[in-house]
Each structure stands twice: as C-alpha cells, then as structure tokens.
C-alpha cells in the first residue's frame, strides 16, 4: 500500500534537511545507505507560480517546491502549510518547453473535488535567491529543468512493490489526458543515478512538451492509478535505490 499524502505545518529547513551535494561530499562512504536523521534535498524552487490548478487550503497561487529523497513537498509560505506527496502518488511529471512543470497527482486531500487526479502547472521563478526566506534556497533554487531532473532521480528511489504485474498492466492502461498540443520535443538522458543530476544530453525532436513513459532516455515519468510505473516500449526500466 502506497503512503498517503499528508498536510504538514512545517517546511524543510537547515535543521532537518541537508542539500544533496553537501551530503555526498560529507558522507561518501555511506552515500548509498541514506540518512534517517535528515531529509536530503535534490532540488527545489523558493518561488514558484501555480499557473493552473488549485490546492486545498492554499489562498495564493505562489508556493515553494522541495524535491526530497523521501517525498515531494509543495509549501505555501503565506498559509504556513503544505502537502507532503509520496512519489508513488505522482502519476505523471513532465517538462513543458515553455518552462513549466506539468504534474498529475492523486487527489488524496489535495482538492475538494471528486476527481481522481489533480493537474498542476508550475512555473519556477529563479529570482535573486538571497531574498528568499528559507536559507536552503540560497544555495539550491533551480528552474524547471533542474527540478524535473531531480524528480526523475528521486522518483527512481521509490519503485512500486508489484513489479511482476507491470507488463500486463502496461497493455491495459489507458493513456493519461495530456494536452494534444503538447507533443514530444526532446529526450533527456537520465540514468536515475544520484551523481548524474548535471550530466544529461538533450537531442532535438519534434515540437511541444517533453513527455515519455518509464525510465531511461526520456522526458517524462508516468505511474498508473495503482501506483505502478510503466515503461515505454524499447526503453530500459531502471529501478535504483540510491537513497531511501
């Protein structure tokens, strides 16, 4: 059973969170074992606009994003609360060529509607990080591409338990409702390893949104409604547990 989405009232801070590069530099011998005492932050944005979609209890369309090894957090500084979202509950994350992140998330406490999923389009703003209140963002305040790659890496740390049924479910799964004008444009190589966040290659393709299925040289990750990740035809399916 996948973990549930939680409403939280404390955001990650320098006391309970360590940045990925700092953790790796200080703990190379146990880099693959994880750290139970602190969150490990792979990416984020201190000022992100919610372009479309709404979240319960959020009064403004501004938020902060934390891409942690354990979960994905959307935080409202104005309201003093946020949502801790397990990666198993993120059915799709994709990168739009306009610089937006497109997310389809399980509607578990996120929205008051009866819809099964919540769709969000988020636009990170890479303004002067020194003006941000959370010190974590003074060193790690990424754009959409940085956050996308961080989500790829962290999502790969949380494979689904029912891998033996994955192939059968792949053939029966209906496609997600991706806007028709967002077509595949580029493929971004990402092995899922923790040390390749800044080591990727972009190849030219068609116009529109970068989106794919599974792990490997893709630009989008999809999970089905049951929490399973589906690998596209011909693409390697890598499941790495670098940190837990």
UniProtKB/Swiss-Prot annotation:
InterPro entries for the chain: ICln/Lot5/Saf5, PH-like_dom_sf
GO-annotated cellular components: cytosol; pICln-Sm protein complex; spliceosomal complex
Subcellular location: Cytoplasm; Nucleus
Top-level taxon of the source organism: Eukaryota
Keywords: Cytoplasm, Nucleus
Keyword Nucleus: yes
GO biological process, one term: spliceosomal snRNP assembly
Keyword Lipid metabolism appears in the UniProt entry: no
Disordered: region residues: 156-176, 222-244
Biased composition (Acidic residues): 161-171
Family: Belongs to the LOT5 family.
Protein name: Protein LOT5
Biological source species: Lodderomyces elongisporus (strain ATCC 11503 / CBS 2605 / JCM 1781 / NBRC 1676 / NRRL YB-4239) (Yeast)
């Amino acid at each position: 059973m996948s973990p549930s989405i939680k409403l939280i009232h404390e955001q990650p801070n320098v006391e309970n969170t360590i940045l990925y590069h700092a953790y790796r530099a200080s703990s190379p011998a146990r880099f693959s074992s994880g750290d139970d005492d602190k969150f490990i932050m792979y990416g984020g944005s201190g000022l992100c606009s919610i372009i479309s979609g709404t979240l319960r209890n959020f009064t403004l369309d501004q938020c902060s994003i934390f891409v942690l090894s354990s979960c994905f957090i959307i935080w409202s500084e104005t309201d003093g609360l946020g949502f801790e979202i397990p990666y198993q509950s993120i059915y799709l994350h994709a990168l739009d060529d306009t610089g937006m992140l497109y997310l389809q998330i399980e509607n578990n406490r996120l929205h008051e509607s009866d819809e099964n999923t919540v769709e969000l389009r988020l636009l990170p703003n890479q303004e002067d990080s020194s003006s941000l209140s959370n010190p974590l963002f003074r060193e790690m305040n990424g754009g959409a591409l940085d956050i996308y790659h961080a989500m790829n890496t962290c999502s790969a740390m949380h494979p689904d338990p029912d891998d033996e049924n994955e192939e059968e479910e792949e053939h029966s799964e209906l496609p997600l409702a991706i806007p028709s004008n967002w077509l595949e444009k580029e493929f971004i190589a990402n092995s899922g390893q923790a040390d390749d966040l800044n080591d990727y290659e972009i190849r030219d393709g068609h116009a529109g949104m970068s989106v794919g299925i599974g792990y490997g040289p893709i630009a989008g990750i999809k999970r089905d409604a049951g929490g399973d990740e589906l690998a596209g035809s011909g693409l390697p399916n890598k499941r790495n547990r670098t940190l837990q």
